[in-house]
């Protein structure tokens, strides 16, 4: 869905130069066609299973409306994400409230909304039970299991190891289900696990699934009737151009194992997954403008997007492909390091990349920026957040406006005694 025309990067049928003339830079530009292709790939690979979009990856309402229209549920991690998921129109019977530190306010909101909960601790279980009794509801729950499985990814996004803050240790989950069965207001109907993000080796998924299914067999003996086994998300994407497993590959790895292990159960649970990055990651390009080219010990290209706009390279050392969006047909000439305008030396988007000759005013495209891009952006250094655009064929529209200087102080208040 990304191509070139007259040496200019195009998103579907639109040149990015046309977009930035109106929006300015930086700007996130998303392809609707690519988003829908990713959604259909999951639906085809897991046609009889439950698919919940991980709202954390990208919470833009327009994009979530498209995702919800394809029949997806939602994995939410906060009251704000639950609010956005409700506006987007996700199936209520497939909204799972995740998270390791839910406040009473968040739990009350989820119980009132009638969503399912992934319970992360016994304290949380007691709070859900208490609130459910207060409002006269029964809440369907799963426990999040920590399986102690290495997902072979960046340590900051590995969530299923024993030292992770998430989930109940797999050796202690039986006790949690025993407690849930004795409490009013909660009904255990599932089991949940999420081992990490940007996973490119499928074997940890299979390892985790087998640990979870061992637990499922055990808790059924307590009288728990499982309606779903949620293995979370985490499928990685091809940031570096070296290849990545597809939803079809993931299905081939885990569905036969899941179906085989279900023979050990008396119930017939559905497999649930929570894709996020692999739905939206490759759909979006960040367009940023060159403010300066500085030569010295290194050739630096200074652009108007830094880790205030895309924090992944600074936070995780992540690799994103870059190109000169207005010189797509030009031959690479020099090695550059692309840096942002933020007052820290870690503000680097791309290191040592061979690009065509870069000049002031050129546009740098940062690819695969659809997941954990805008949602992790900030107003650091007093920089208003950028716009987001959706392209559909030869049409495009702004789906999030660029912030103004006024937005920097919108929620601030000056006490009268300072005036």
UniProtKB/Swiss-Prot annotation:
InterPro entries: Ala_racemase/Decarboxylase_C, DAP_deCOOHase_LysA, De-COase2_C, De-COase2_CS, De-COase2_N, De-COase2_pyr-phos_BS, Orn/DAP/Arg_de-COase, PLP-binding_barrel. Its cofactor is pyridoxal 5'-phosphate. The keyword Lyase applies. Pathway: Amino-acid biosynthesis; L-lysine biosynthesis via DAP pathway; L-lysine from DL-2,6-diaminopimelate: step 1/1. Pyridoxal 5'-phosphate binds at residues 234, 274-277, 372. GO terms for biological process: lysine biosynthetic process via diaminopimelate. The active site is at residue 343. It is an enzyme of class 4 (lyase). Substrate binds at residues 277, 312, 316, 344, 372. It catalyses: meso-2,6-diaminopimelate + H(+) = L-lysine + CO2. Its EC number is 4.1.1.20. Homodimer. This is Diaminopimelate decarboxylase.
